[in-house]
Amino acid sequence: MGSSSATANRFLLSKIATSEGHGENSPYFDGWKAYDRNPFHPTKNPEGVIQMGLAENQLSFDSIEDWIKKNPKASICTPEGVEEFKNVAIFQDYHGFPEFRKAVAMFMSKARGGRVTFDPNRVVMSGGATGANELVMFCLADPGDAFLVPSPYYPAFFRDLGWRTGVQIVPVDCDSSNNFKITKEALEAAYEKAQKNNINVKGLIITNPSNPLGTTLDRNTLESLVEFINQKNIHLVCDEIYAATVFSSPTFTCISEVIQNMNCNPNLIHIVYSLSKDMGLPGLRVGIVYSYNDDVVNIGRKMSSFGLVSSQTQHMLPSMLLDEEFVARFLETSPKRLAKRHGVFTKGLEEVGINCLKSNAGLFCWMDLRRLLEDQTFDGEMVLWRVIVNEVGPNVSPGSSFKCVEPGWFRVCFANMDDETLEVALKRIRTFVRQGKKAQDQVVQVKSPKRWKSNLRLSFSSSSTRRFDQESVNVLSPHMMSPHSPLVRAKT
């Protein structure tokens, strides 16, 4: 189809559907495309791109698989469980199975150390955290309204919060001077800027633990956020989908703990949760909205009709999540494995002088490559990113995709691969840095087809910059979608 025909066809479609609201043209998704075209495999494609742009927890699958084998009756797809097939297959109310909501509420409590309890009647289902975030926006805001979001923040918030709802994002700028902590001054500045631009701010959304920082918010910060939204009479949405990934001190403090001892309006407090990160089950599409506002619960249930959790999943998970022995073991083992993997990765980077922001949670590191930039700008960051993806081989995500205010930061995921693949990725990165130091400001011609043995460089002359810009056109064009698009497979 020619470009003129494609343009004409767009006029036949809705503005929402044909807008750029999905964000697929960002470097965040370009890295996915590079991986999708040339995925790493230890024997079939050892020179391929290693996926380090996917925040997925694959370190505890064995625990879940072992439970499934020991509990065949939990699934309707086994001889032991097939007798429940009809009850699961027929029409289900959008409120969700009572046992499912009870199990989710119990797990949410245990994932937060049992310090708070959750009412199953306030659990609203959705298709993953993506659907849950959008559902909250539909409940709380009108098209054109805005939410404050501290940066750096999850790149797909642009899609999740605003593509179909028409809600705007107003970044709250945070920087490395205080390890990207959220300050009252930054909140006030963002709020006042929105007011001057006649933007109606309906709320503040935070991720705790943070994606991409891998840090947790302390009680004092959370209390200041609650005070801020109460003063402004706006909503606070807390995305807590990484609650059970905390692997070292300080411990996780959830918003529910904080408001127990505060004089605040609970109608303004809402939580988004999911089993995608804590349990590594993004394919099951379990998203949850937990609101202290009765109207949001009631309206959210109606809206959840457009993205329910499958009945089969609702049937299986209660048996697992209400198994106290399994849950206790899982919540003890999973963080230990994350801590070990985090330690291996960060120490491996430190061998060549690369540091990450100190973190205690999540499935990723916030890697500091500022000293490797020839040009301390976001253009310089993109030059370095293209070299890393195209020449070195891991798909990492540039900080600019997360609206970071400082160039040179990258999110690197470490929990979505086996130990051997992680070692290959580390070897490639370390070799790149070491050979770049030797090359200094010289542009060294790549001699070996093996990426981690190539003479790669860290400094880029204008000619080499143009060369990689050209490569980005040829290799990372947003219009070159492969049949198995990562945009289809992307996890929340």
From Swiss-Prot:
One of its GO terms (molecular function) is transaminase activity. It comes from the Eukaryota. Its EC number is 4.4.1.14. The keyword Calcium does not apply. Its cofactor is pyridoxal 5'-phosphate. Transmembrane segments: none annotated. GO terms for biological process: ethylene biosynthetic process; fruit ripening. PROSITE patterns: AA_TRANSFER_CLASS_1 (PS00105). Homodimer. This is 1-aminocyclopropane-1-carboxylate synthase 1.
